[in-house]
């Protein structure tokens, strides 16, 4: 799709979406996004220029379909996939990608860690993906050098450059964790639960040096600028339990992420901010508001948040509750959580369950936000239900296969696709049918006449 668009810009010194937006140029990617989101192209351009909307679109991911993350656009959902040292392979990861996209993933992160063939896995995922692919480069850095304590600045830049050339559209970089935050971490119940953050912290504590990603942040920006890789500024100190939510460690890092955001914007690099995590319902709004203040309204991208800690096996449900609220308060993208969260590596079915839970959360928030067209399918579904149009109901459902499967468990015969009831109420107790029959046989003219006569009689008394 984007081959010709990118070819036209080959001789431009800078080719990031933010650069063009600041110059007043509406790119083809912005036009595409505007059409998909039912927005004015000029609004898209101005929001990208301001940093409140990002279009993650590496110039080397040429078959990518552009999408937008920001408050003027629909709430987006990210799916995490990736191989580990103990499970999964290229074919499995591509199937997870396809399942993610099938059920509505707007972006996908390849979080492969410890796998033997990470480059090949990523190449296969990008080649098969119509959506932006994100990574946490630290995982491959450690995989290549073997020991995080041996990490050098050159190791970081080498892997970032390699992944950027492959077509990765956004990097999660844990650059906001600083040495001065370490005393606050000791006060926590669960310390650092971010993988990238914990690895970075171990290097810092061993060498008594500042965060290497923070130290060479300008060099990282140069790579991002060359390939138009967006930055997803990682929250190393996101709370891993309700006890640690909204503590000083989390909020102090958030302020640093705001400073890094301004530095990235100065180099025309797009930014979004990663957020928690585990947050009680009553603290979600405050977390969103603080991000908007500290990070200058850069799009907020949150993991959940989980609103309880005892939902093991059902964390996709507990976190979808927090996700819907977070999106309503102002979060732009939700990172899904699967039923396997805290328990193991998700399989293809777990990806499906997590994606659908989060599409429900995102869609619910968009309806509440009155996003143009967000409720159209819901209204169509209401019409189809009242008309007993079962095939239309299946078609409109977020998961048509599951909707049909549940219906057919008790009424599998094709004749029941025309029935004016389901197995819940049967033919005699269906409220839709009872109401329709009552309305159809009701004499409205007679009712109106009786009502008018009653009103006259009451007036005379």
UniProtKB/Swiss-Prot annotation:
It is an enzyme of class 4 (lyase). Zn(2+) binds at residues 278, 342. Keywords: 4Fe-4S, Iron, Iron-sulfur, Lyase, Metal-binding, S-adenosyl-L-methionine, Thiamine biosynthesis, Zinc. GO terms for cellular component: cytosol. It catalyses: 5-amino-1-(5-phospho-beta-D-ribosyl)imidazole + S-adenosyl-L-methionine = 4-amino-2-methyl-5-(phosphooxymethyl)pyrimidine + CO + 5'-deoxyadenosine + formate + L-methionine + 3 H(+). Substrate binds at residues 80, 109, 139, 174, 194-196, 235-238, 274, 301. GO terms for molecular function: 4 iron, 4 sulfur cluster binding; carbon-carbon lyase activity; zinc ion binding. InterPro entries: ThiC (IPR037509), ThiC/Bza_core_dom (IPR038521), ThiC/BzaA/B (IPR002817). The keyword 4Fe-4S applies. The keyword Metal-binding applies. Its EC number is 4.1.99.17. HAMAP family: ThiC (MF_00089). This is Phosphomethylpyrimidine synthase. It comes from Nautilia profundicola (strain ATCC BAA-1463 / DSM 18972 / AmH). The gene is thiC.
């Amino acid at each position: 799709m984007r081959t010709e668009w990118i070819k036209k810009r080959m001789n431009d010194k800078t080719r990031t979406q933010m650069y063009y937006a600041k110059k007043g140029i509406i790119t083809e990617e912005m036009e595409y996004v505007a059409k998909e989101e039912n927005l004015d192209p000029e609004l898209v351009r101005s929001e990208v220029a301001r940093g409140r909307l990002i279009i993650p679109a590496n110039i080397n991911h040429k078959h990518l379909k552009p999408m937008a993350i920001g408050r003027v656009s629909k709430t987006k959902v990210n799916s995490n996939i990736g191989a580990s040292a103990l499970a999964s392979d290229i074919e499995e990861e591509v199937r997870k990608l396809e399942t993610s996209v099938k059920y509505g993933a707007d972006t996908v992160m390849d979080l492969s860690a410890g796998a033997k063939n990470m480059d090949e896995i990523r190449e296969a995922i990008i080649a098969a993906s119509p959506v932006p692919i994100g990574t946490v480069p630290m995982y491959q850095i450690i995989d290549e050098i073997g020991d995080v304590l041996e990490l050098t600045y050159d190791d970081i830049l080498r892997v970032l450059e390699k992944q950027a050339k492959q077509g990765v559209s956004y990097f999660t970089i844990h650059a906001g964790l600083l040495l001065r935050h370490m005393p606050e971490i000791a006060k926590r119940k669960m310390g650092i639960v971010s993988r990238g953050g914990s690895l970075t912290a171990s290097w810092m504590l061993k060498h008594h040096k500042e965060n290497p990603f923070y130290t060479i942040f300008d060099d990282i920006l140069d790579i991002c600028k060359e390939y138009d890789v967006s930055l997803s500024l990682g929250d190393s100190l996101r709370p891993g339990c309700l006890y640690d939510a909204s503590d000083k460690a989390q909020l102090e890092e958030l302020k640093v992420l705001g400073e890094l955001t301004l530095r990235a914007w100065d180099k025309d690099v797009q930014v979004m901010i990663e957020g928690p995590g585990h947050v009680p319902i009553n603290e979600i709004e405050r977390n969103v508001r603080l991000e908007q203040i500290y990070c200058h309204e850069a799009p907020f991208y949150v993991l959940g948040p989980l609103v309880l800690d005892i939902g093991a096996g059902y964390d996709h449900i507990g976190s979808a509750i927090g996700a819907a609220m977070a999106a309503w308060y102002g979060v732009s993208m939700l990172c899904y959580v699967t039923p396997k969260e805290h328990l193991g590596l998700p399989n293809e079915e777990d990806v499906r369950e997590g994606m659908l839970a989060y599409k429900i959360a995102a869609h619910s928030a968009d309806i509440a936000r009155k996003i143009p067209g967000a409720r159209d399918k819901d209204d169509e579904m209401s019409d189809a239900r009242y008309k007993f149009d079962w095939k239309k109901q299946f078609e409109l459902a977020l998961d048509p296969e599951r909707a049909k499967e549940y219906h057919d468990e008790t009424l599998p015969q094709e004749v029941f696709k025309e029935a004016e009831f389901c197995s819940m109420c049967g033919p005699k107790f269906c409220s839709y049918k009872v109401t329709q029959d009552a309305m159809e046989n009701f004499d409205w003219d007679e009712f109106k006449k009786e009502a008018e006569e009653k009103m006259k009689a009451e007036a005379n008394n």
